[in-house]
């Protein structure tokens, strides 16, 4: 990566970037929400598109001079529609959280009832957590997983929906290693007259590759991030399989009177000017590049390897005596319940960091520890697979993590971490990140 100008102009920022580059190149990234973009995506994100304000949408901007950024946004929209098989898409949300906010604002009033997966059972802050706007503006009710299987209890979901009569049901997760039965969720939503929103931020890359069930035929709204398993720049997106007249009765004036707005019009207005102003056109250009990459046949091979690596790693953890919530994985991640190892997620996260392995502590279902301590760790295989690692590497990584955990409370912990860190560094250098080289001075 060419950073000569930055190095001359701002040495402090250059050094920070160089050090972070070294960390990414020589340590193992296993945080499930992280991945490595292509150089083409990074070049688009670092392009002159960052200089252009473009409030509004292609062909209907509030600023002049938008004819070329319109090309980039139309490419992103058209490619996303082809990739996900949807009729409507908005690529302007700055994040998955802002995409979720736009959907909630478009169909809910303050005080309306919503349902989402419990944060401690693998859900997300924007699905009704009390510390988030979604749990503060709305009456949020959380469904959870079965205590024995670790899988979402659809009977509980239906019972709760019939009791609280939500306006919106959210199906999605940030730490759930199984798929979602979108058809069953839609049947429940229809019984109570609720909207259904799927948040596929984590498994989107696997879904577009046909490896997990497709939410488009069943959900009114689908949101996602554009990084994680999609391997694009950090950002969000809103989709609808089919557009429809908004059931809230919102109208728009026409030459002949007025008409009911389509839901796509309501959603676009909620994104801009509802919660955002100018879109990040350099990021939208990067999204277009990433969607183009995901449309290629080799992306499906990548997604298949991500899932295969996760399966191999989870099976090795199980054979080493670890408990995995839900008993295994069908996607790119796994949630290790460490309670039978008598160690906390916080300790494991910190100790693995010393060994050159990055994970995040994570609450497990029915956890009795705080979110700052936790009884589990979340592990994902999207980033390591981008480096070219395979099933054998995945099993080796599980064994190295086990070595670190078993020694964490012993006097040998530091020496074990040093030894594992060297093995991890060698593994990473055998599977390099092409074109990421920035050397600190």
UniProtKB/Swiss-Prot annotation:
Annotated catalysed reactions: (6R)-5,10-methylene-5,6,7,8-tetrahydrofolate + glycine + H2O = (6S)-5,6,7,8-tetrahydrofolate + L-serine
CDD domains registered for this protein in UniProt: SHMT
Classification via Gene3D superfamilies: Aspartate Aminotransferase, domain 1, Type I PLP-dependent aspartate aminotransferase-like (Major domain)
A biological process from GO: glycine biosynthetic process from serine
A single GO molecular function term of this UniProt record: glycine hydroxymethyltransferase activity
Record site feature (Plays an important role in substrate specificity), residues: 227
Modified residues (N6-(pyridoxal phosphate)lysine): 228
Matches recorded under PANTHER family: SERINE HYDROXYMETHYLTRANSFERASE (PTHR11680), SERINE HYDROXYMETHYLTRANSFERASE 1 (PTHR11680:SF35)
Family, per entry: Belongs to the SHMT family.
HAMAP family cross-referenced by the UniProt entry: SHMT (MF_00051)
Main function: Catalyzes the reversible interconversion of serine and glycine with tetrahydrofolate (THF) serving as the one-carbon carrier. This reaction serves as the major source of one-carbon groups required for the biosynthesis of purines, thymidylate, methionine, and other important biomolecules. Also exhibits THF-independent aldolase activity toward beta-hydroxyamino acids, producing glycine and aldehydes, via a retro-aldol mechanism.
Protein name, per record: Serine hydroxymethyltransferase
Lineage of the species this protein comes from: Bacteria, Pseudomonadati, Chlorobiota, Chlorobiia, Chlorobiales
Gene name linked to the record: glyA
